[in-house]
C-alpha cells in the first residue's frame, strides 16, 4: 500500500526482522535440544535420524518437501491466473492495472508466498542445526539473488521459472560447499559470489536488449 519498490521493501523488512530477532533473543544463541535431538519429531520433518523407518537414516526428507513445494508453485505460476497475473505485474504493472486486474492483491500474494517459503527455510535450518542466532542467514540474500538470476529470472520482472531458480540455487550451493574443499577462504567466497552476481545481472541486461 505504500507503493515502495519491491526490492527496497524486501530489504527494509529483512532489516526490521533481523533487528526484532536480536531484540527478542538479546543477541544470544537459542538452542532446541529436545525438539531437534536424534529421532525428535521436529528434526525428522527435514532429515531421518533413526533406523527402521520408511527412509534410510540421514535421508534428507527436506528434499522431498522442496520437490513438493516446487511442483506446487510451478503449477501456480504457469497454470493459474494468480501466477499469470503475478508475472504480468512483474512485466508491466501499469498495463496490468489498466487491464482491470487487482494489482495490490496479487502483489500481496507474491509477498506472502515469498515470506512463507523464507520462514519454512528458517524452520528447516533450526531443525537441522538445533540452534538459532540473530545473525544466522546474514549474506544468504546475496546467494538467493545470485541463484535466482543465474536461474533465468529477470530483475526487471516478468520472466522466470521455478525449475530455473532451483537450478540456479543448486549451482550456488555447490559452489559454497565446494569452495572450502579447494582451499578458498570465506572472504574470497564472498568476493566470488559478488562477481557471479554482477556477471549474472549483466547477462540479464544483455538478454533484454
Tell me what each language-model feature is.
Residues 2-4, 80, 101, 160, ...:
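Membrane-helix interface residues
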Residues 14-21, 63-76, 111-122, 150-153, ...:
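Hydrophobic core segments of alpha-helical transmembrane domains in multi-pass membrane transport
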Residues 71-111:
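Membrane-helix/interface signature in polytopic inner-membrane proteins
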Residues 6-8, 82-85, 105, 163-164, ...:
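Residue-level recognition of membrane-helix boundary sites in multi-pass small-molecule transporters
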Residues 91, 98-105, 175-209:
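Cytosolic-side transmembrane-helix boundaries in multi-pass membrane proteins
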Residues 6-80, 106-109, 129-134:
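Transmembrane helix-bundle core of multi-pass membrane transporters
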Residues 111-112, 117-118, 128-193:
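Transmembrane alpha-helical segments in multi-pass inner-membrane proteins
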Residues 6-7, 58-66, 107, 139-141, ...:
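Loop-to-transmembrane alpha-helix initiation sites
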Amino acid at each position: 500500500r505504500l507503493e515502495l519498490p519491491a526490492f527496497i521493501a524486501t530489504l527494509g523488512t529483512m532489516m526490521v526482522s533481523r533487528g526484532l530477532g536480536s531484540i527478542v533473543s538479546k543477541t544470544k544463541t537459542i538452542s532446541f535440544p529436545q525438539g531437534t535431538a536424534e529421532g525428535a519429531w521436529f528434526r525428522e520433518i527435514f532429515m531421518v535420524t533413526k533406523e527402521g523407518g520408511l527412509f534410510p537414516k540421514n535421508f534428507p526428507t527436506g528434499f522431498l518437501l522442496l520437490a513438493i513445494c516446487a511442483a506446487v508453485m510451478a503449477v501456480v505460476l504457469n497454470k493459474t491466473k494468480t501466477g499469470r497475473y503475478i508475472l504480468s505485474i512483474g512485466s508491466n504493472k501499469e498495463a496490468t492495472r489498466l487491464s482491470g486486474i487487482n494489482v495490490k492483491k496479487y502483489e500481496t500474494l507474491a509477498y506472502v508466498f515469498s515470506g512463507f517459503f523464507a520462514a519454512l527455510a528458517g524452520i528447516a535450518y533450526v531443525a537441522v542445526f538445533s540452534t538459532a542466532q540473530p545473525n544466522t542467514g546474514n549474506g544468504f540474500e546475496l546467494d538467493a539473488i545470485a541463484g535466482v538470476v543465474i536461474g533465468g529470472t529477470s530483475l526487471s520482472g516478468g520472466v522466470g521459472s521455478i525449475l530455473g531458480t532451483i537450478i540456479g540455487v543448486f549451482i550456488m550451493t555447490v559452489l559454497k560447499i565446494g569452495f572450502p574443499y579447494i582451499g578458498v577462504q570465506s572472504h574470497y567466497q564472498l568476493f566470488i559470489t559478488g562477481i557471479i552476481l554482477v556477471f549474472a545481472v549483466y547477462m540479464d541486461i544483455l538478454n533484454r536488449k
